Amino acid sequence: MKRVKRNLLWRNRPDRLICIVIARWRYAYRAFLRAENVNTLEQTIGNTPLVKLQRLAPDNGSEIWVKLEGNNPAGSVKDRAALSMIVEAEKRGEIKPGDVLIEATSGNTGIALAMIAALKGYRMKLLMPDNMSQERRAAMRAYGAELILVTKEQGMEGARDLALAMSERGEGKLLDQFNNPDNPYAHYTTTGPEIWRQTSGRITHFVSSMGTTGTITGVSRFLREQEKPVTIVGLQPEEGSSIPGIRRWPAEYMPGIFNASLVDEVLDIHQNDAENTMRELAVREGIFCGVSSGGAVAGALRVARATPGAIVVAIICDRGDRYLSTGVFGEEHFSQGAGI
């Protein structure tokens, strides 16, 4: 009966037509969000969800929002940069389908590049340290990439040196994510605007792990151009800590795309803090992510606790399934029924 009365009242409203239009638009928009047909896989990159943490955020009026970059088709934030580097090089006439592409990677960029290379018809050669997870290696090979390993001791510096040498010998086109401006350009044109729109301009702090520094450089550049100040916080491992995807670069290997003036503060994150926060995100927030994402949220928690009323945005770089073989989600890390 109540429903009938409400319907009758609604039908007698003078703005009934406007209500119909709004209702139909909302329905159409929700349907669009649920299932959108696209012509190519690359059209599904970006426009990732921004989710508010419900249980980990401090009770001081601050908010922590995380951008779920694992929702990209190859599973990480690096999908954006990979697409940008290849598409922009194509526009300049530097590469064409059938060419050999070379890149040094710690994992996620390699997977993303392998996906785009498969999609567009390139041959992909990827160089990485041999201590990266088996899941990452398998994903690259699944996309058809050739994987070349350097030793753990050589690390990413060794992988970068070998990639450069291969390029100089004419073995392929080096994309060079560490010095390629098309890397941060992807985040200047997509990630930054998305965050600004999704927070309705309320963001006060942006927190990002620093690997190639492409994400923090591009997002920061965009946010600096908006009408309100936003504090930019970068994260690097503490001395002696090892966090996949985050680096404490020696001066001679600092990525050329990095602009220190775009970062207000750099926090040191211990490996244990990153891993513990990663597991807490899974157990308490239902967000299954990788170690560098745990580091980003650990940094965001520091910022939020120290800044009541802050609106903090952090990047969830990838998904946790790429780290299962490393033991970071082993049973020994969880107490029965309680999680951590």
Specify the residue positions occupied by each region the protein language model found.
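Short N-terminal alpha-helical targeting/association segments
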Residues: 4-7, 95
